[in-house]
């Protein structure tokens, strides 16, 4: 069987590679068995597969758009920054080691072998693999050690489409410059350009498109308009686009922007219903209607930073006044104590938590729990009482064990005696419509406002919406020809 593949590279981070791959996966899935692939992903937003493997959330979304089950082979190397130039390396969905950049690059040959195995397994089960690069493709200082851009291109010999973002300016220079800097053996496989996030009259753009084509000999396949994506974000680069979102809403939820924040996508389902404001630990907390403490790649260090900034006292002052939620590392911080045997911070020590929940957490070994779960709501307190006994789904990605005397979702989490401080290990909590509506309804009614339960767009509708935008603005016949389908 012919090993068909298509590689989507970008001129920089956050130009739209992930969304383009998602759309192409959706479109091709109508006629072919499609798998997404990203050799190496650096992200703190991750997903747990059905068999308990951890991959980047973007590849999970792309797999769902393609109508296939997410697997670890779709993102064989996941790098999760921990700070101080060290990342946790997750290999085929399992924690492998904490490595500095230099240590990681020393093991690059081992990574190449992992990629080859993953690709071979995907090709056995699928007709075509739609692959995604990372950041900018023309990182000339990394060519000999790269596995995700030039490395993937050389490994697969795949036809390449290069994506540029016009919103930030300089798109023609970035596309032309990337082509000029790519090695010749990779450059010759670039078969098309896509310009993303355009606002305005496309006729004004056409002279530039023609000049770009004339100078490079590469066709522009289309120009995608700027539009609101209704699928989760991949990385913290996009957090900057959220800070003033939904300013017209009367209800404000403050998400503490921890220095090592992870899985901030947990709060995206709230954005259409309330103003979600991401608050740096050195900023004023203001007067929010609810507070969220998110996950983190290092609970202990972020707790220490929270305390050094004085944000801990600001959060504690809201106990009993507004709902306070902690998810994963945020849940651990809400407790009385955290004992670290050296797993988190390198030395054995006990740390005082925020003291808002009667729990204690222990980091005893370098072992991560990764699992998809279904739980029942223990409807204690005014927020959760209306949905007592209802089911919710989520996934866990955490180290450490927490002891709780008053659980909140089955055997998970904790809730205080008033029902206003809630902690859980469950990522994807607010993806559950019942939880989302229970919280937002409470916040609205507390302010004397009428709330109509949201009818969130389904995942499938979101994928179709994205695919339709791409189909309407891209030369799909040419794209199919490039992909060989």
From Swiss-Prot:
Pfam families: CbiA, GATase_3
Repeat in keyword set: no
Keyword 4Fe-4S assigned: no
GO BP terms: cobalamin biosynthetic process
Active site: 328, 427
Boundaries of every GATase cobBQ-type domain copy: 250-435
Pathway given in the UniProt record: Cofactor biosynthesis; adenosylcobalamin biosynthesis
Keywords: Cobalamin biosynthesis, Glutamine amidotransferase
SUPFAM superfamilies in alphabetical order: Class I glutamine amidotransferase-like, P-loop containing nucleoside triphosphate hydrolases
Molecular function GO terms recorded: ABC-type vitamin B12 transporter activity; catalytic activity
NCBIfam families: cobQ (TIGR00313), PRK00784.1 (NF001989)
UniProt family annotation: Belongs to the CobB/CobQ family. CobQ subfamily.
PANTHER family: COBYRIC ACID SYNTHASE, DETHIOBIOTIN SYNTHETASE
Function: Catalyzes amidations at positions B, D, E, and G on adenosylcobyrinic A,C-diamide. NH(2) groups are provided by glutamine, and one molecule of ATP is hydrogenolyzed for each amidation.
Name this polypeptide is given: Probable cobyric acid synthase
Gene: cobQ
């Amino acid at each position: 069987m012919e090993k068909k593949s298509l590689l989507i590279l970008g001129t920089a981070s956050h130009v739209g590679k992930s969304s383009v791959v998602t759309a192409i996966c959706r479109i091709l899935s109508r006629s072919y068995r499609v798998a997404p692939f990203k050799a190496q992903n650096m992200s703190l937003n991750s997903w747990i597969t059905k068999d308990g493997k951890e991959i980047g959330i973007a590849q999970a979304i792309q797999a769902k758009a393609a109508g296939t089950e997410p697997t670890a082979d779709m993102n064989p190397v996941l790098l999760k920054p921990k700070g101080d130039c060290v990342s946790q390396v997750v290999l085929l969905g399992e924690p492998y080691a904490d490595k500095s950049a230099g240590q990681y690059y020393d093991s690059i040959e081992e990574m190449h072998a992992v990629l080859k195995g993953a690709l071979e397994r995907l090709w056995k089960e699928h007709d075509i693999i739609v692959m995604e690069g990372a950041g900018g493709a023309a990182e000339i200082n990394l060519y000999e050690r790269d596995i995700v851009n030039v490395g993937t291109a050389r490994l697969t010999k795949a036809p390449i489409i290069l994506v540029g973002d016009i919103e930030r300016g300089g798109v023609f220079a970035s596309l032309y410059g990337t082509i000029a800097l790519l090695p010749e053996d990779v450059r010759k496989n670039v078969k098309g350009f896509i310009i993303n996030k355009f606002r305005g009259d496309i006729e004004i753009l056409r002279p530039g498109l023609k000049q770009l084509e004339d100078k490079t000999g590469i066709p522009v396949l289309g120009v995608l308009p700027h539009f609101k994506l209704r699928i989760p974000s991949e990385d913290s680069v996009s957090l900057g686009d959220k800070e003033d979102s939904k300013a017209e809403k009367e209800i404000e939820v403050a998400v503490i922007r921890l220095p090592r924040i992870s899985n901030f996508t947990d709060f995206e389902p709230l954005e259409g219903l309330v103003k979600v404001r991401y608050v740096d630990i050195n900023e004023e907390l203001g007067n929010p209607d609810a507070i969220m403490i998110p996950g983190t790649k290092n609970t202990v260090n972020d707790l220490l930073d929270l305390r050094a900034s004085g944000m801990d006292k600001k959060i504690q002052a809201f106990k009993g006044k507004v709902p306070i939620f902690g998810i994963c590392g945020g849940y651990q911080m809400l407790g009385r104590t955290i004992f670290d045997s050296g797993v988190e911070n390198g030395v054995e020590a006990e740390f005082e938590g925020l003291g808002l929940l009667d729990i204690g957490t222990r980091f005893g070994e370098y072992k991560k729990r990764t699992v998809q779960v279904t739980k029942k709501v223990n409807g204690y307190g005014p927020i959760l009482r209306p949905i007592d006994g209802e089911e919710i789904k989520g996934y866990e990605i955490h180290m450490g064990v927490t002891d709780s005397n008053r659980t909140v979702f089955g055997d998970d989490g904790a809730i205080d005696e008033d029902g206003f401080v809630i902690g859980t290990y469950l990522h994807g909590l607010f993806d559950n419509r019942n939880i989302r509506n229970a919280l937002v309804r409470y916040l609205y009614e507390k302010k004397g406002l009428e709330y109509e339960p949201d009818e969130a767009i389904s995942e499938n509708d979101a994928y179709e919406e994205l695919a339709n935008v791409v189909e309407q603005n891209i030369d799909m016949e040419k794209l199919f020809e490039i992909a060989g389908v």
